[in-house]
Amino acid sequence: MTEHISSAHVPTGSVPATWYADFFTYLPNEFWRRAATEQWTAADVDFVESRLGLTAGSRILDVPCGSGRHSLALAARGHRVTGVDLSTEAIAHARAVAHARAVAAAAGGTVRFEHGDMRDLERHGVFDAAICMGNSFGYLDLAGTRAFVDAVARAVRPGGGLVVDFGVTAESILPGFTGEANTMVTGDITVVANEEYDAEASRLISRYRFSQGARQLEATAIHHVYTSGHLGDLLATAGFTDVRRHADPDGTPFTLGSGRLLITARRR
């Protein structure tokens, strides 16, 4: 059966700007839930705790939180976590896992998941830290990204920390970019991905075919590509300082060709 057909075969210019509103259904979410190992998540959470100097009971905003793997792991370490995401499937999954695990009860942490847009954070100075993991920073165009960064800045208290995880900086994807098809398999889910770079709009267009038995999904994702310097300027304009760049949770410095950018910053 076909679960959902998105904009996989329409011209690049016709891909809706709000592609992310319909993209994150069961097959994409389940694929990434399986692909992200416990070791990967633990390394990310170690990085967040150590680089931001978090103490037990810290109030953390995870936005967008996806299926909640970082939120759940942080809560299990004794933090008070709020996860926000626009995908109803991902939020439902995260809530179910939290309930099944009775997560964080022994450690004294808490976690709650809210359905909502990453730009609509009606909180002011209540979080000790915010995290934006897994490439979602590039989902929005420049105006939307500014709105998101401003919303996070309002939500984090003065002196609070921020971690942004982004694998689609210009320094990461453009050196050696070929656009060749890539096939990924996890369990009984297969994904074929084709990528093209829209130089006029500085966007990476990713067209996916997900397959799980008779279930198939074709969908297109857009990542707006920013330079490392541009990201730093966006954060500084919103009120963040002490911006530092890493290529890996072990603290490796970010350089040209690094496949991943982990930015840490402080709310001025």
Name each model feature, range by range.
Residues 69-120:
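Class I SAM-dependent methyltransferase SAM/SAH-binding core
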Residues 143, 163-234:
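SAM-dependent methyltransferase
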Residues 128-143:
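A short SAM/SAH-binding and catalytic strip from SAM-dependent methyltransferases
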Residues 1-58:
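Conserved class I S-adenosyl-L-methionine
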Residues 146-158:
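A short glycine-rich, Lys/Arg-flanked "PGG" loop and its adjoining helix->strand segment in the class I
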Residues 120-129:
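A short acidic, Gly/Pro-enriched loop at the edge of an enzyme's catalytic core
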Residues 64-68:
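Class I SAM-dependent methyltransferase "Motif I" SAM/SAH-binding loop
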Residues 226-268:
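C-terminal lobe and adjacent flexible extensions of AdoMet/dcAdoMet transferase-like proteins
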